[in-house]
Amino acid sequence: MNEVKESLRSIEQKYKLFQQQQFTFIAALEHCRENAHDKIRPISSIEQVQSYMEHYCNNSTDRRILLMFMDICSELNKLCQHFEALHSGTPVTNSLLEKCKTLVSQSNDLSILRAKYPHDVVNHLSCDEARNHYGGVVSLIPIVLDLMKEWIAHSEKLPRKVLQHGTT
């Protein structure tokens, strides 16, 4: 369990760095959307961000911030697998884990996702951006981090036997 907590802390630190550069991230997505002639559709999946990065990203600053987003998503995905291996779960932890796995899936539609208070990532966007283009993609990481913290909190309340059973 300590290893999982440490992994989550590490991801949170990377996210804090990423969050400080949200305007750079939005600008990078905007540049890629322009290059792709795709200004109408919202950013709706991790897969779409990856495609933009691979095919429509023209400068190192944009590539770096998009890669940072992709790396955090990849680490969240790996942590989901680590959670799964830790114990067989309860209905509550299994539900939280399924939500996490769905959210970090490459093709999951993020367009309607919106982080709520205390997260202010959506508030930093203009109304048009928040409503139409980037609200989902900037909400993904804080929502998944919250679900993972909740999973850990519920898992720590389980009897030791349940936790040990999952590792044998």
From Swiss-Prot:
Pfam families: SPACA9 (PF15120). The record marks 117, 119 as: Essential for interaction with INCA1. GO terms for molecular function: calcium-dependent protein binding; microtubule binding. The keyword Phosphoprotein does not apply. One of its GO terms (biological process) is flagellated sperm motility. Keywords: Cell projection, Cilium, Cytoplasm, Cytoplasmic vesicle, Cytoskeleton, Flagellum, Nucleus. GO terms for cellular component: acrosomal vesicle; axonemal microtubule; axonemal microtubule doublet inner sheath; ciliary basal body; ciliary base; cytoplasm; cytoplasmic microtubule; nucleus. Testis-specific. Expressed in round spermatids. Disulfide bonds: none annotated. The keyword Nucleus applies. Its main location: cytoplasm. InterPro entries: SPACA9. It is found in: Cytoplasm; Cytoplasmic vesicle, Secretory vesicle, Acrosome; Cytoplasm, Cytoskeleton, Cilium basal body; Cytoplasm, Cytoskeleton, Flagellum axoneme. Microtubule inner protein component of sperm flagellar doublet microtubules. Interacts with CABP1 and CALR. Interacts with INCA1. Interacts with microtubules. Microtubule inner protein (MIP) part of the dynein-decorated doublet microtubules (DMTs) of multiciliated respiratory cells and the distal singlet microtubules of monoflagellated spermatozoa. Forms an extensive interaction network cross-linking the lumen of axonemal doublet microtubules. This is Sperm acrosome-associated protein 9. It comes from Rattus norvegicus (Rat).
